[in-house]
Amino acid sequence: MKNLFIKGVLLSCLVSIIASCTDMKKSSSVVIDKDQIKKEIQERENQFAKLLNADEVKKIGYYADDAVTFYQNMKPLRSKEDRLEFFKDDLSSNTNKISFTTIEVFPSNDGIQVVEVGYYTVVDSTNTAIYTGHYMSLFEKRDGQYVCLRDMSASDME
């Protein structure tokens, strides 16, 4: 009798564990459309380039307020004001145009955060590439739109 009771308790525990694991698996399966995320990120990059090229830096909504940008050979830009000042200084002295190409995206399991690997090209007034390089950006979806939290770049030019 005692042996039968122990077997019953063990069987109940085993069934409970299996049932709870099965329920967790069902509830945590979120379908991530990597191609759609890549398209959304590329749209953000296109909008960012368009505003930079038009010298409309105050309209740039690409970055989150708490974003940090790591450019080469300078201290990280940690505030919106620092970033705006950098763009103003950079854009005021040239007529170059920049474009960004999303190469790969690596979304989190829930699609809220995305790491992007991309390529940038800066061309002069004759449409000749004068700077090229790669970048990595970390995006987070806030209020239904991806915003950049961290980014860094590396030039291909010597």
What is each PLM-predicted segment?
Residues 1-32:
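Bacterial Sec-dependent N-terminal signal peptides
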Residues 21-62:
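Short, low-complexity N-terminal intrinsically disordered segments enriched in polar/charged residues
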Residues 22-26, 132-157:
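Short beta-strand edge/turn micro-motifs at domain boundaries
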Residues 35, 56-112, 129:
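A solvent-exposed, acidic/Ser-Thr-rich amphipathic alpha-helical stretch
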Residues 74-76, 121-122, 154-156:
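Solvent-exposed loop/turn segments at secondary-structure junctions
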Residues 83, 87, 101-106, 118-122, ...:
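Hydrophobic/aromatic beta-strand elements that line small-molecule binding cavities or substrate pockets
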